[in-house]
A protein has these predicted regions:
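Phosphate-handling substructures
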Residues: 17, 22, 59-114
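Short beta-strand scaffold positions
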Residues: 46-47, 110, 131-132
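Active-site signature of alpha/beta-hydrolase-fold catalytic machinery across serine-
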Residues: 58, 139, 143
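Glycine-rich phosphate-binding loop signature in dinucleotide/nucleotide-binding domains
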Residues: 38-40, 119-126
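Short, solvent-exposed loop/turn segments at secondary-structure junctions
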Residues: 9-11, 50-51, 71-72, 134-137
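Domain-level recognition of soluble alpha/beta enzyme cores
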Residues: 145-167
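Generic beta-sheet signal
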Residues: 2, 42, 126-134
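Active-site-proximal alpha-helix that buttresses catalytic centers in soluble enzyme cores
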Residues: 1-65
Length: 167
């Protein structure tokens, strides 16, 4: 089974790119609440972003591999006023950047899917827990299940959240 964990609530800082945000300590209890829902003996991997690595540290005492390709959809801008509408544009037109400096969503899908394929191959028959990001997990689940990206689910993702896929 593949366990995709969206990171805990970040401490959002205007002027600082989201890839550098850390967890908001006020949300630690929400992260700890997921611990019992995750398999202790699984293979654990995380995005390199601080909020993802910090989430992993709160969820397991075991080793967690860091995989650069699990990072979120790359977004150079530190703050986008209409974030949800901009990401929805990325889903509607995945081959073009939805905002100046953003990675096309198709590139994110290809990068994350390749990385997860490698993890699953290396741990065939084992559970895997991956700590990462909402947009990346949404396109990954779409790819793994052969279904369109579930934008309603993406909008409803909590900090943290858990998606399971029989992979």
């Amino acid at each position: 089974m593949l366990f995709l964990v969206r990171h805990g609530r970040p401490l959002q800082v205007r002027g600082v790119a989201a890839e550098h945000w850390e967890l908001d300590s006020a949300g630690f209890d929400d992260v700890w609440a997921l611990r019992d829902r995750l398999p202790a003996g699984a293979a654990w991997y995380s995005s390199p972003e601080p909020k993802a690595q910090q989430t992993a540290q709160l969820l397991t005492d075991g080793d967690v591999g860091v995989v650069d390709a699990l990072r979120e959809h790359r977004r150079r801008e530190a703050w986008v006023e209409d974030f949800h509408a901009t990401v929805e544009r990325a889903f509607a037109e995945p081959t073009v950047p939805a905002y100046d400096g953003w990675e096309p969503l198709e590139e994110c899908r290809a990068r994350v899917t390749k990385a997860v394929g490698g993890i699953l191959s290396a741990h065939a028959g084992e559970d895997a827990v991956l700590i990462g990001h909402g947009t990346a997990w949404t396109v990954l689940v779409s790819e793994l299940t052969g279904t369109p990206p579930d934008l309603a689910r993406w909008r409803d993702l909590a900090f943290p959240d858990l998606i399971t896929v029989d992979a």
